[in-house]
Amino acid sequence: MSGKTKRLMVMAGGTGGHVFPGLAVAHHLMAQGWQVRWLGTADRMEASLVPKNGIEIDFIEISGLRGKGLMAQLTAPVRIYRAVRQAKKIMRDYQPDVVLGMGGYVSGPGGLAAWLCGIPVVLHEQNGIAGLTNRWLARIAKKVLQAFPGAFPNADVVGNPVRTDVLALPLPAQRLVGREGPIRVLVIGGSQGARVLNQTMPQVAATLGEQITIWHQVGKGALPDVLQAYQQAGQGDKHQVVEFIDDMAAAYAWADVVVCRSGALTVSEVAAAGLPAIFVPFQHKDRQQYWNALPLEKAGAAKIIEQPQFTAQAVSNLLAEWDRPTLLAMAEQARLVAIPDATERVAAEVAAASK
């Protein structure tokens, strides 16, 4: 890169759904010669994960207000003011050319501080319905991007940046044609697991018997109980049941169909991998995960089953209906919905906003 090295400040924290897409964009721009720093909080996952990725991180003191008591609500303006002051000092010291907000509590004070310092703000909303912080920041942002249509009325749809090993998987027609034997069902509840999946899928295994084979990620601490549930269902040694899957790309490559929650990053990875899915949205009051999954259901690539209706019989009926030609057609539709160059699209908008 000729001339002055461009500087980016990424604001993202709290959960992997915010941090991992931010890391993907950061690495892409670093490979082009950009200098990148991170704004986060010291008590969330970004504090350890970001430095492991070779990126320096600065911290401000901020936390969420949802579900907090009256005293926390009353002192919120003081805490937000203090966090904005902290963020302004960091911005003035680092002097970024542009700031990228990927979500989490840190984005609010960070985005406001950048705006007050005259630094352009680019926002990326990962979910199908915008969070409170991004709805507010959208008023002062130079550019607003969204992963799924509908979060903002006029924002560009750019997808969610996903891991390169998932993007490198063979296309469904290369991967799935010629497969025989039981339908391969990958069950993912996220790294924390999902109790409804852990309770229901052993019964699905018992109902469908040799029609399916399951690879089930149960989440931290749930392995003994889920193994016992498979044992009691007469399915003890017939399926692969693990606490955590380290290589998700390998799991996607193995699978014919996925049963999972519909967090933003999960939905984007399933689409990029080209896999049919049964999505079970987390019962959040704004139905965020339902809106994430809806584009894939509308495309004929997935089925949404709300948690109260997620029974062994309902899941068994669906899986029994889906033969291999149907699954291949759904997989190809999933891949059509995917935006495989999301990282490049977000990075290009960041670069454009910095000029």
Swiss-Prot record:
Reaction(s) this enzyme catalyzes, per UniProt: di-trans,octa-cis-undecaprenyl diphospho-N-acetyl-alpha-D-muramoyl-L-alanyl-D-glutamyl-meso-2,6-diaminopimeloyl-D-alanyl-D-alanine + UDP-N-acetyl-alpha-D-glucosamine = di-trans,octa-cis-undecaprenyl diphospho-[N-acetyl-alpha-D-glucosaminyl-(1->4)]-N-acetyl-alpha-D-muramoyl-L-alanyl-D-glutamyl-meso-2,6-diaminopimeloyl-D-alanyl-D-alanine + UDP + H(+)
UniProt entry keywords in alphabetical sequence: Cell cycle, Cell division, Cell inner membrane, Cell membrane, Cell shape, Cell wall biogenesis/degradation, Glycosyltransferase, Membrane, Peptidoglycan synthesis, Transferase
Transmembrane segments: none
GO CC entries: plasma membrane
Pfam families: Glyco_tran_28_C (PF04101), Glyco_transf_28 (PF03033)
Gene Ontology molecular function terms on file: UDP-N-acetyl-D-glucosamine:N-acetylmuramoyl-L-alanyl-D-glutamyl-meso-2,6-diaminopimelyl-D-alanyl-D-alanine-diphosphoundecaprenol 4-beta-N-acetylglucosaminlytransferase activity; undecaprenyldiphospho-muramoylpentapeptide beta-N-acetylglucosaminyltransferase activity
Pathway(s) of this molecule: Cell wall biogenesis; peptidoglycan biosynthesis
UniProt: UDP-N-acetyl-alpha-D-glucosamine binding residues: 15-17, 127, 163, 191, 245, 264-269, 289
GO terms of biological process kind: carbohydrate metabolic process; cell division; cell wall organization; lipid glycosylation; peptidoglycan biosynthetic process; regulation of cell shape
Localization terms from the record: Cell inner membrane
Topology in the lipid bilayer: Peripheral membrane protein
Origin superkingdom: Bacteria
EC number, as in UniProt: 2.4.1.227
Role this protein plays: Cell wall formation. Catalyzes the transfer of a GlcNAc subunit on undecaprenyl-pyrophosphoryl-MurNAc-pentapeptide (lipid intermediate I) to form undecaprenyl-pyrophosphoryl-MurNAc-(pentapeptide)GlcNAc (lipid intermediate II).
Family from the record: Belongs to the glycosyltransferase 28 family. MurG subfamily.
Protein name in the entry: UDP-N-acetylglucosamine--N-acetylmuramyl-(pentapeptide) pyrophosphoryl-undecaprenol N-acetylglucosamine transferase
Annotated source species: Yersinia enterocolitica serotype O:8 / biotype 1B (strain NCTC 13174 / 8081)
